[in-house]
């Protein structure tokens, strides 16, 4: 049962897990905040760009559509009924994840934290909370069918663990300047 919940939670969240990584790879371009300050600090910083947001969102949607193509054989192989993604749900998860990360950057700047500085709790769940809120607003029926209370609990427990493991791994490989 727990294996089924973990597989479903991970699969359902992949379109939200991947966009921020894709945004980093796309990097550069014009900052969303246009370089503007508010109360002596940047609104968001150079790390939040229009290009990264667009590429991250598109990557999440394309990933969801690719997952749809392999859902049936993956379900059979894993012995789990994995969900397929309606296009509005895919977009909401991907764009919601990007917006959650942008919102966290805003909060980090307001609290005096620099780009890349740790903000425990917020760093691990910002994108998940906004992605889930977005998908529940945009495609309520799909979200209720996929994100049962048990799956939501697994997502909220699993995500911080995945966040730490992937960030430490990226740091060890020299892909990140800090392990958080």
Swiss-Prot record:
Q: Does the keyword Repeat apply?
A: no
Q: What is its EC number?
A: 2.7.7.67
Compartmental location: Cell membrane
Task: Show the GO MF annotations.
Answer: CDP-2,3-bis-(O-geranylgeranyl)-sn-glycerol synthase activity
Superkingdom assignment: Archaea
Say yes or no: keyword Transmembrane present: yes
**Pathways involved:** Membrane lipid metabolism; glycerophospholipid metabolism
Mode of membrane association: Multi-pass membrane protein
NCBIfam families given in the database record: PRK04032.1
Catalytic activity reported: 2,3-bis-O-(geranylgeranyl)-sn-glycerol 1-phosphate + CTP + H(+) = CDP-2,3-bis-O-(geranylgeranyl)-sn-glycerol + diphosphate
Q: Which gene encodes it?
A: carS
Q: Which GO terms describe its biological process?
A: glycerophospholipid biosynthetic process
User: What keywords were assigned to this record?
Assistant: Cell membrane, Lipid biosynthesis, Lipid metabolism, Magnesium, Membrane, Phospholipid biosynthesis, Phospholipid metabolism, Transferase, Transmembrane, Transmembrane helix
Family from the record: Belongs to the CDP-archaeol synthase family.
Name of the protein this chain belongs to = CDP-archaeol synthase
Record field: transmembrane: 5-25, 54-74, 78-98, 118-138, 142-162
